[in-house]
């Protein structure tokens, strides 16, 4: 059973709630990730995802002045590095989100996406399924 520590992306983009949406989106593009972890000091305050950026863009607001705090999902669910991929997938599916911060103690050490979980499942087919050939 795969653990999140083996699947998570450790290239975490971090922003504060007072970061503009444009700056946060640029960070996602540079790092080639779909989310930004929002920190208030050492506290995990929220997560801003591609979907949130799309909602902000569709609102017509000027994203160069609109702040992450307005669009982020506050107090996000998080997972431990020792959580199984299956448990993380269940949490994500039940709650309707695609990104899950991974926290070791109080430190954000990565983010796992539904794509990461799917890729891990494809790399290790379930028992009883024929290998592609």
Where are each of the predicted segments found?
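Amphipathic alpha-helical segments that mediate coupling or scaffolding at interfaces
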Residues: 7, 27, 56-57, 71
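A glycine-centered beta-loop-beta connector
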Residues: 28-31, 36-52, 92, 100-115
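Short, charge-rich, low-complexity interaction segments located
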Residues: 55-66, 125-126
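Bateman (tandem CBS) regulatory domains
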Residues: 2-12, 66-76
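The conserved cystathionine-beta-synthase
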Residues: 14-32, 39, 79-96, 103, ...
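Cytosolic regulatory modules rich in charged/polar residues
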Residues: 84, 108-133
